[in-house]
């Protein structure tokens, strides 16, 4: 009798610890970027501040994400967002140019067979005139 109870207990423990197999799923979370500039018309050589937020319903997409300030399709600066998705760039403007901020997307909690991704986004363009 003692042997049967021991075998039953061992079987129950084995089943409880093994758990159900993981189910594969995708989570593709959209993002969007805002941008504001401190001054749209400056003297050549003046500094301006570009700031905004990376927005998403999923906090993991907003927090600690790499965003890039782009001018003439070239990356001029890179920053990590704050826990709430905020970013700020301070740049010297030497000539009139159009700027935008880009987020390339990222993978989150990459554990096979799950696919969790924050989708890429970019802000609207802002033109800063330097005279």
Model-derived regions, located:
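Secretory targeting and sorting signals
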Residues: 1-24
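Beta-strand-rich domain onsets/edges
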Residues: 23-49, 53-55
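Extracellular interdomain linker/stem segments of modular secreted and single-pass surface proteins
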Residues: 29-31, 125, 129-131
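Cytosolic terminal low-complexity segments enriched in Ser/Thr and acidic residues
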Residues: 39-42, 110-112, 129
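Short flexible loop/turn segments that cap and initiate beta-strands
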Residues: 59-74
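Local beta-strand/beta-hairpin segments that build beta-sheet-rich folds
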Residues: 76-78
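Glycine-centered loop-to-beta-strand initiation motif
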Residues: 80-91
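Enriched for extracellular/lumenal, surface-exposed ectodomains of secreted and cell-surface proteins
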Residues: 95-124
């Amino acid at each position: 009798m003692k042997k049967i109870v021991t075998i039953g207990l061992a079987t129950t423990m084995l089943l409880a610890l093994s758990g159900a197999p993981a189910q594969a799923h995708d989570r593709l979370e959209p993002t969007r970027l805002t941008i504001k500039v401190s001054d749209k018309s400056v003297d050549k050589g003046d500094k301006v501040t570009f700031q905004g937020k990376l927005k998403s319903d999923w906090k993991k997409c907003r927090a600690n994400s790499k965003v890039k300030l782009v001018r003439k399709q070239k990356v001029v600066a890179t920053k990590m967002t704050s826990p709430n998705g905020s970013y700020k760039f301070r740049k010297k403007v030497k000539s009139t140019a159009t700027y935008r901020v880009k987020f390339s997307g990222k993978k989150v909690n990459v554990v096979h067979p799950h696919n969790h991704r924050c989708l890429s986004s970019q802000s609207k363009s802002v033109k800063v005139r330097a005279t």
